[in-house]
Curated annotation (Swiss-Prot):
Positions with a binding annotation for ATP: P92, V93, A94, K95, G96, M97, A98, S99, S100, T101, A102
Effect upon mutating T134A: Does not affect catalytic activity
Name of this chain's protein: L-threonine kinase
A Pfam match: GHMP_kinases_N
Encoding gene (name): pduX
Induction note: The BMC operon and BMC production is induced by growth on 1,2-PD vitamin B12 medium.
Cellular component aspect of the GO annotation: cytoplasm
Disruption phenotype: Growth is impaired on 1,2-PD minimal medium supplemented with cobyric acid, but is restored on similar medium supplemented with vitamin B12, cobinamide. A double pduW-pduX deletion grows as well as wild-type on 1,2-PD.
Length: 300
């Protein structure tokens, strides 16, 4: 799901794309603080940056990122008045799919390119967390990431191939509202489980074992039920067993759920039928079949 631009070659435009995430593979108290590993999927925010006055209806966080990038290279702040940011994205907003991270990360890379610079992933992550908690979709590899301050960035080996049937709920939750919840005590209580999940993520990537990745994600999803419970969760776990799926993952600060599978091996039509039969579609009326992809922002 990519947004396409019709700019002619030679136009003075910088275009960058960043993927969405189907929630997180894992999120919780790991190595002394709350951290996450995002689950990048093939649904993208595309951002074009040109030399022109700003659009009236620009996204405020993308404009804030332009200002951060200018400040990073010590350019005059008023240059922002001659930089236009055009965001094209159909990623669902406020549901745990990293729509905001995709927007601001792509904006940062496109703006940097427009100014004649490039951004390494560490600097990009630091710029993003200076605006809001950030998903690890900004990294090419699956990465354990401290999404609040970017202090921890531990990359994994390439993961095994995974598809996800993403269950989209009409329920929205802003990331900043999740972060206002009193949650540290519950996070710490699940720290042993999350350490196990993190170990399984690393093992899954080293051994190319999708079942291990599903096991890791399911452990984290179960732990998340004490913080932000998903409706029909027990029925979803039963469905994973019944259809012999790899596991499930959730948005720990949102409402989406991902059923982890192989579209060549698992019967998607049967799975969707089971969702309806178990009345789970009342909670997740929309489903999207996506694949997990490499993360990172790419210039077009």
């Amino acid at each position: 799901m990519r947004a396409h631009y019709s700019y002619l070659k030679g136009d003075n435009v910088a275009v960058a794309q960043c993927p969405a995430s189907c929630g997180e593979l894992i999120q919780g108290w790991i190595l002394g603080s709350e951290k996450l590993v995002s689950c990048p999927v093939d649904w993208y925010s595309t951002v074009a940056v040109t030399a022109a006055p700003p659009l009236i209806n620009e996204r405020p966080l993308s404009r804030a990122m332009v200002e951060r990038v200018l400040a990073h290279w010590q350019y005059p702040a008023h240059w922002s008045n001659e930089i236009r940011v055009d965001v094209r994205s159909s990623i669902p907003v406020a549901k745990g799919m990293a729509s905001s991270t995709a927007d601001i990360a792509a904006t940062a890379v496109a703006t940097a390119h427009h100014l004649g610079h490039s951004l390494d992933e560490t600097t990009l992550a630091q710029l993003c967390v200076s605006i809001e908690p950030t998903d690890s979709t900004v990294f090419h590899q699956l990465t354990l990431f401290d999404h609040n301050n970017a202090a921890t960035q531990i990359a994994c080996e390439p993961p095994p191939p995974i598809d996800l049937l993403v269950l989209e709920s009409p329920v929205t939750l802003r990331t900043q509202d999740y972060h206002r919840l009193p949650r540290q005590q519950k996070l710490i209580a699940s720290s042993a489980t999350l350490q196990q999940a993190w170990n399984l993520v690393q093992e899954a990537c080293i051994t190319q074992n999708p079942l291990r990745l599903g096991e890791a994600a399911t452990l984290s999803a179960i732990a998340s039920q004490t913080l932000l419970p998903k409706p029909g969760f027990t029925a979803l776990l039963s469905l994973v067993e019944e259809c012999d799926l790899y596991g499930l993952n959730v948005a720990h600060s949102g409402s989406v759920v991902g059923l982890m599978l192989d579209r060549k091996r698992h019967d998607i039509a049967r799975l969707k039928g089971k969702l309806a039969e178990k009345k789970l579609t009342r909670h997740w009326p929309k489903q999207h079949l996506l694949k997990m992809v490499t993360g990172g922002v790419k210039l077009q």
